[in-house]
């Protein structure tokens, strides 16, 4: 499971001219699910993201988590995070989970966050063409992988 985590001052997701998710200060998470991911990856990834100390404290040091600031989160499914560009010029997505498997793990990821943490979690629509509007704060962008490949 891979996540691109961006600290934002605001973000929104639009589908067919309708805003389906909108937040102020918080995190925008692009979540990719691979064919080898399992349910056990969900808790590791969700807990890591929510507790990352990437928000500034009173001394302008990154020392506070999303929980500390009671920020918001948008999660957007992003199978292209498993695009392999090593050969040729067109990415291969053979490492991405099937849509059926990815949907189950994506939904479980969202449920885990909403049940465990007292934060506002919003989402994009699985397999939809979305327009994601992001106002990066920092910018702060982190790449996480539950298989610890980085």
Swiss-Prot record:
Listed Pfam families: Tyr_Deacylase
Principal place of residence: cytoplasm
Localization per record: Cytoplasm
Listed GO CC annotations: cytoplasm
Enzyme Commission number(s): 3.1.1.96
Gene Ontology MF terms: D-tyrosyl-tRNA(Tyr) deacylase activity; Gly-tRNA(Ala) deacylase activity; Ser(Gly)-tRNA(Ala) hydrolase activity; tRNA binding
GO biological process: D-amino acid catabolic process
Motif Gly-cisPro motif, important for rejection of L-amino acids, residue numbers: 138-139
Catalytic activity: glycyl-tRNA(Ala) + H2O = tRNA(Ala) + glycine + H(+); a D-aminoacyl-tRNA + H2O = a tRNA + a D-alpha-amino acid + H(+)
Cross-referenced InterPro entries: Daa-tRNA_deacyls_DTD, DTD-like_sf
EC top class, as a word: hydrolase
Keywords tagged on the record: Cytoplasm, Hydrolase, RNA-binding, tRNA-binding
Source organism, top-level taxon: Bacteria
HAMAP family listed in its UniProt record: Deacylase_Dtd (MF_00518)
Record's comment describing the protein's domains: A Gly-cisPro motif from one monomer fits into the active site of the other monomer to allow specific chiral rejection of L-amino acids.
Family to which the UniProt record says this protein belongs: Belongs to the DTD family.
Entry function: An aminoacyl-tRNA editing enzyme that deacylates mischarged D-aminoacyl-tRNAs. Also deacylates mischarged glycyl-tRNA(Ala), protecting cells against glycine mischarging by AlaRS. Acts via tRNA-based rather than protein-based catalysis; rejects L-amino acids rather than detecting D-amino acids in the active site. By recycling D-aminoacyl-tRNA to D-amino acids and free tRNA molecules, this enzyme counteracts the toxicity associated with the formation of D-aminoacyl-tRNA entities in vivo and helps enforce protein L-homochirality.
Record's subunit section: Homodimer.
Protein's recorded name: D-aminoacyl-tRNA deacylase
């Amino acid at each position: 499971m891979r996540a691109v985590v961006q600290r934002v001052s605001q973000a929104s997701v639009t589908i067919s001219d309708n805003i389906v998710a909108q937040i102020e200060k918080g995190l925008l998470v692009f979540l990719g699910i691979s064919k080898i991911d399992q349910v056990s990856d969900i808790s590791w990834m969700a807990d890591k993201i929510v507790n990352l100390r990437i928000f500034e404290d009173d001394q302008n040091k990154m020392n506070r988590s999303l929980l500390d600031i009671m920020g918001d989160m948008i999660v957007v499914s992003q199978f292209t995070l498993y695009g392999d560009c090593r050969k040729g010029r067109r990415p291969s997505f053979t490492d991405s989970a099937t849509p059926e498997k990815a949907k189950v793990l994506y939904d479980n990821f969202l449920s885990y966050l909403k049940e465990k943490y007292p934060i506002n979690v919003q989402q994009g629509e699985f397999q939809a063409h979305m327009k994601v509007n992001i106002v990066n704060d920092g910018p702060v962008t982190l790449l996480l992988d539950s298989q610890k490949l980085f």
